Amino acid sequence: NPYVRYKDDDGNYIYEVDRYIPISGGGLGQTFYNPLYNTTLNTIDEEKYNDVTNNFGVDWTIIEGLRLKGSFSFTHQNTYGDNFKPARHTDFADYSDEDFDRRGAYIGSRGENFSYDASAVLTYFWQLDKHVVNANLGWNLQENVTREFTVKTEGFPNENLDYISFATQYEKEGAPAGDEYTSRLVGFLGNLNYSYDERYLL
């Protein structure tokens, strides 16, 4: 609204920009707060992400007709999230006197993921005149581990004490939440083929 005043005479952002009171006198009306005021506060809204990935492969002819191919890859990821709003933030303007000490909030989250994939295939090929033997033996191994947690706290009367440990309590009726799960996969393969004169297969 271009007609709403959002700064005082000194050029500072004001906290409350407008108040609506019904003409009929019914209801309590509504107060509108200035979101620009929050820019003057010490707030935190950060997300960080680290990712390390590596791939390795080998292709080795051990002897004529015998060949080994293998690969290995892994990924390690870390995520960090932090969100802090002090007690004077407009999000808490309508808190009742009973919840006065709950004003201010900090949400911290952490996550970690580690996964790897390893595989190898040994191939054998032999031929004599019209006789051909072909064999393959291989395996595959995968694992994925994920851990994550979130902590929601409240009660930050001093905006300069902006670390989660300065909270007065966990979120009302809340508790730290997290999850951890692991998945694994193992596979094997093998085959043996014989052919004669490129017409008869076994």
What kind of region is each of these model predictions?
Residues 70, 118, 186-192, 196, ...:
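Extended, hydrophobic alpha-helical segments in both membrane/secreted and soluble proteins
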